[in-house]
């Protein structure tokens, strides 16, 4: 009887210890770090859409790091998320990236390019506009005041001796959401629009006419239209995560360039998954004829955008110290 009781006690102890050990293992297996990545559901953020769709970043970082993707609709909201620490790495336009660098006193830096070019100047069908000079007295739409396309337009106007009406000139610049431009043109409320892809291809498919192609907008189309930024604090605390992110970003870039047909399908499927809508095959294919997918930052274009931002009053000072971290 005593032996049986002893066996029972020992067995109970073993089960308890084993259970405790299993609970401990469960705790150790939990992900101990998190990386928060911001992006737009837009084809100019191609690598983000590829990595999110295929889960390549999650797989490469392993079981100890969880990846959280957060979609934004505008640069300022993403910048605020960077400042608050809600995101660590982000795909964003070069102009808000510059603004974030200045406002954060250098804590937000550019760590890679993502895409280049990808914007066109189109006009309402039949409008008497054949060059930038013809925008005199016209209404031109841009997606958002102070964004990349707006700065490109301001540079084009200045190069042709024109100014927006807000600066005593004759060109009315109107901020119109990309999705609303087609209807606005159709109503005759605007004469022209400088828009990013895929909206350029979409407008051209709906009877708008080309005024300037992507390589006539700024820097022969080699300017950065989307870059990758990161918080320096996160980079210093998690260099291995940032390094792995950049490797996967590079791999996604290579995949898009080497296998465009299948990559565009992946990107389009991800857009549909996220927004409920996909692009027509002809639209996304035409759009990518005007978009360069690259990791190499064009420093001249970034500096140019910084100069325009300062001269137009969108930033109070030029970036001091490190803006592009290689």
Model-identified regions with their sequence ranges:
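Bacterial N-terminal signal peptides that target proteins for export
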Residues: 2-11
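Hydrophobic helical h-region of N-terminal Sec-dependent signal peptides
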Residues: 11-19
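C-terminal motif of bacterial Sec signal peptides marking the signal peptidase cleavage site
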Residues: 21-24
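Bacterial signal peptide processing site
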Residues: 26-28
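Short, glycine-/small- and polar/acidic-enriched structural segments
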Residues: 31-165, 170-175, 191-197, 211
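Pocket-lining segment of extracytoplasmic ligand-binding domains
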Residues: 95-96, 167-170, 174, 179-268
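Secondary-structure end/capping motifs
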Residues: 236-312
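C-terminal solvent-exposed extensions
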Residues: 306-326
């Amino acid at each position: 009887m005593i032996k049986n009781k002893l066996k029972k006690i020992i067995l109970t102890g073993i089960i308890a210890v084993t259970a405790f050990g299993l609970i401990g293992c469960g705790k150790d297996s939990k992900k101990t770090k998190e990386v928060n990545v911001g992006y737009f559901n837009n084809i100019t953020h191609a690598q983000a859409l590829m990595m999110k769709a295929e889960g390549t970043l999650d797989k490469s970082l392993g079981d100890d790091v969880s990846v959280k993707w957060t979609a934004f609709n505008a640069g300022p909201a993403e910048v605020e998320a960077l400042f608050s620490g809600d995101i660590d790495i982000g795909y964003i336009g070069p102009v808000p990236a510059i603004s974030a660098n200045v406002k954060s006193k250098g804590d937000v830096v550019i760590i890679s390019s993502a895409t280049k070019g990808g914007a066109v100047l189109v006009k309402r069908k039949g409008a008497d506009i054949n060059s930038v000079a013809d925008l005199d007295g016209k209404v031109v739409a841009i997606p958002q005041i102070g964004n990349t396309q707006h700065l490109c337009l301001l540079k084009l106007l200045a190069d042709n001796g024109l100014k927006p009406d807000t600066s005593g000139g004759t060109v009315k610049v109107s901020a119109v959401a990309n999705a609303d431009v087609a209807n606005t043109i159709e109503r005759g409320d605007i004469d022209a629009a400088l828009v990013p892809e895929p909206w350029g291809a979409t407008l051209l498919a709906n009877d708008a006419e080309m005024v300037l192609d992507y390589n006539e907008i700024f820097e022969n189309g080699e300017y950065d239209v989307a870059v990758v930024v990161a918080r320096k604090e996160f980079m210093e605390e998690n260099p291995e995560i940032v390094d792995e992110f950049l490797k996967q970003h590079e791999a996604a870039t290579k995949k898009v360039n080497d296998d465009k047909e299948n990559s565009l399908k992946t990107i389009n499927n991800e857009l549909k998954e996220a927004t409920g809508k996909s692009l027509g095959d002809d639209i996304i294919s035409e759009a990518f004829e005007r978009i360069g997918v690259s990791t190499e930052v064009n420093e001249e274009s970034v500096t140019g955008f910084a100069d325009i931002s300062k001269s137009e009053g969108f930033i109070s000072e030029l970036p001091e110290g490190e803006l592009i971290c290689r």
